Amino acid sequence: MTSERKMLVTSALPYANGHLHLGHLVEHIQTDIWVRTHKMLGIQCISVCGDDAHGTPIMLKAEQLGITPEALTAEIKLSHEKDFKAFAIDYDYYHTTHSPENQALATTIFERLQAGGDIVKKTIRQFYDPVKQMFLPDRYVKGTCPKCAAVDQYGDNCEVCGATYSPTDLINPVSVISGASPVEMESEHYFFDLPRYEELLKDWTRKGHLQTEVTNKLSEWFEAGLKQWDISRDAPYFGFPIPGVPDKYFYVWLDAPIGYMASFKKYCDERGVSFDEFWDKASKTELYHFVGKDIVYFHALFWPAMLAASGFRTPTAVYTHGFLTVEGQKMSKSRGTFIEARAYLAHLHPEYLRYYFAAKLNGRVDDLDLNFDDFVNRVNADLVGKVVNIASRCAGFINKRFDNRLSSELINQKLYNDLLSAREFVIDAFVSRDYARAIRQIMDCADKVNQYIDANKPWVLAKDESKLNEVHAICTMGINLFRILITYLKPVLPMMAKASEEFLNSEPLHWGSIDKPLLNHRINTFKPLMVRVEKEKIEAMLVQSKESLMTTPIKENTPVEDSNLISIEDFAKVDLRIAKIVNAEPVEGADKLMRLILDLGDAQKQVFAGIKKAYDAEELIGRLTVMVANLEPRTMRFGVSEGMVLAAGDGQGIYLLQPDAGAFPGMKVK
C-alpha cells in the first residue's frame, strides 16, 4: 500500500529536568499508535520530538547539582530516549531545543516578527531576588493569598481558593530560591503583539483544526481578550540570547515549539528531505501536533499566530488529550502513584500499558484513569486470554502434529471474510484517534475466533487419528484469524507483532497483507507472546515508587534559614558511630534498598539503606562507614531497621561516608 500523502507529526517536548512518568507516556503512546497506523497505510509519516531544554528550573537545578545546564539536559535526554525506546515509542528523530538548528530558527522567526512590526517593547515591574540577583518567575515566589489568606501559595494562583493574581499581590512574598523577601524592579521586555492576529486566529480555530471542546474553550479566551505575549527573560537565564540585546533571552515558550521545526530540520539535513516542502507557507503536506490540555493555549493561539506572522505554514490540526489520573486521583508521590517510566519497566511489560492506554483513549479531551484492577483484567482477560490464547491453542497442534506446516485449505472463508470486513472500521477508528473503539472491535473479532475454536474442539478431535485432517484445518483457520487480529493490533503492540511475524514466518504485517491467508505455509515453533499480569508486580512497582520518594537524597530549592538552626545540645543527642559492614544483600522486591549488617564493636545492628543502585553488595562488605546508632528502630515491610547510614547525594548519585584510616568499629564521631 502506498500513498502520495506526506505528514509530519509531533508530540509535546518533555521538559529536561526530570525523568519520564506515566503521565508523559499517555501522549507519546497516543502519538506513536497514530503514526504507526499511517505508516502501515504506506503514507510518508515522519514523527519528531525532542527535549525542552531551556528555562529557569533547569538553570537552578543544574546549579544545585553543581553541573552545567548543558550536562544536566544531555543526561536527561539520554534517560528520555532510553525510556521511549523501552516503550517502543519510535520517533524518526529525537533532538533538543538547545541546538544550533533551534537557535537559528528562533532567531529567524524573531527577526521576521520584528521586521513585520509584531514585536513591542515595554517596561514592566516584577519581583527581584536581592540574594540570587535575578528576576523571579511567578512560580518562584510564594506568599499568602490576597483573596483567601491561605499561606504558602505560588505567585500566579492560589491552590486553595483558585484565585489568580500577580506575584506582587501576594502578602508577605518570599523567594522560593533563597528565602529572601523579593523587591520590585523595572525591566524592559519584548512582547509579541498577539491581539494583532485575533481575526486570523478566530478563523483558524473554527475551521476544524481543533477538537470541538478546545474550540469552545478558545472562544472564552477570545471573549476575555487576547493580550500581548512576553517572549523575553532577563539574565541570568538558560536559553538563547536575543540578538543585539544585552542580558535578554528568548522565553522558553518561544523556542520550545520551534523545537519541532529544529528537530525536523536536523532530520532533513541527515536524510536529504526538503524542510521547505513541509514548512513553507504554501506547503501541501500535513502537520499535526499532539499536546496535553494544559498547554493548548500556547499551541492553539501563540504558535499558529507566530508561524503565520513569520511566513511559515500553520498546523493542519492540534490534537489535545486530558490528564492521567491513578485510581481516580491525581498522581501522588506519597501514595506511590507518581510512577516514573523506569519504575514501571522494572516490574511490568511495556506493552501492557500501551494496550491499556489504547483501550481508554477516545480522541476527546477527557482525562484517562489508570485503575489497576481494570488494568489487570483488560490485559489478562482480553489481550492474553482472548488474543494470545488463540495462537497458543492452535500452534501446539501445528507444531507437534503437522511438522509446523499449515493446511493447504481455508475451511471457513465466511469467518475469515467476516474478520477481514472489520479492517476499514479499525483503521478509521485509529485514524480518528478513537483507539478505544478500535480495541472494542478487535476484541469482538477475537470473541468470534474463540467461539469458533471452542465449538470445533480440536483438542477432542485430536484423540481420534481419523480426525487429524479436521484438526489441521481448524488450527490453520485459527492461526490465520490470529494473524488478522495481530495485524489490527500492530500499531498498539509493535513488539508482540514482531514476535508474531517471527512465529508466523512472514514478512512484516501491514493493512493489505491479510487479504490472502497463509496456506501450505511453514510456521516456526510457538513461543509465549505475552504472559499474564501478576498483581504482586503492581504492588512491587507501587512500593518502589514510594521508596523513591523516601530515599530522595536532596530536596530542591530549600534554602537554609535561621529557623532550621539547632543548638549544640541538640546535635549532641545524635550518637554517630563508626560501623563496619559485615554483610550486605539487596532486598528482593525493593528497587533501592540494601540490607546491611553493621558491626559496632560490641554489637551488631541491621539497617535498610536506599543504596542498591549505587553499590553492589560485594563491594560494601568490609567497608567502614558512619551510622546513627541511637535512632529509634523502624519496622518496615522487609524487617526492622535499627539505624541509618550516612551518605551524600546530588540527586544523581549516592555516596557513602567513609572514615580515614585508623578509625575502628564503635568509635564515636564527634
UniProtKB/Swiss-Prot annotation:
One of its GO terms (cellular component) is cytosol. A motif ('HIGH' region) lies at residues 14-24. Pfam families: tRNA-synt_1g, tRNA_bind. Binds 1 zinc ion per subunit. Its EC number is 6.1.1.10. The keyword Electron transport does not apply. It catalyses: tRNA(Met) + L-methionine + ATP = L-methionyl-tRNA(Met) + AMP + diphosphate. GO terms for biological process: methionyl-tRNA aminoacylation. Keywords: Aminoacyl-tRNA synthetase, ATP-binding, Cytoplasm, Ligase, Metal-binding, Nucleotide-binding, Protein biosynthesis, RNA-binding, tRNA-binding, Zinc. A motif ('KMSKS' region) lies at residues 330-334. CDD domains: Anticodon_Ia_Met (cd07957), MetRS_core (cd00814), tRNA_bind_EcMetRS_like (cd02800). It comes from the Bacteria. Zn(2+) binds at C145, C148, C158, C161. Its cofactor is Zn(2+). Is required not only for elongation of protein synthesis but also for the initiation of all mRNA translation through initiator tRNA(fMet) aminoacylation. Belongs to the class-I aminoacyl-tRNA synthetase family. MetG type 1 subfamily. Homodimer. HAMAP family: Met_tRNA_synth_type1 (MF_00098). This is Methionine--tRNA ligase. The lineage of its organism: Bacteria, Pseudomonadati, Pseudomonadota, Gammaproteobacteria, Legionellales. The gene is metG.
